[in-house]
Amino acid sequence: MPRALEPEAAWEAVQLGLAEILDVRTEIERRRYGAPPGARPVSLVKHMASPEGPGSIYLCQHAIRSKVTLRRGAAEVAGGFAAWMDAGLPVEEVD
């Protein structure tokens, strides 16, 4: 899997069951903007030392925080959640 996936490619991988989106944004960000369907909220600090394995795609608001995981060979959504929204991909409300 490429290390930086365009939002559409990340969503396709999720729909095919090949990947899971790990959302490293804060709870405030998730509540304010929503989240991709099925995205799992995770702590970036906990995952910096040991990112999840293949099939994990990290997502932050603007693809800045998620770059930390790239150094460990993980994948990220290129452009972050902002690019996800710009692409018109599905978003769920977060309570």
Feature annotation, model-predicted:
Residues 1-20, 27-57, 62-95:
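Rhodanese-like catalytic fold shared by cysteine-dependent sulfurtransferases
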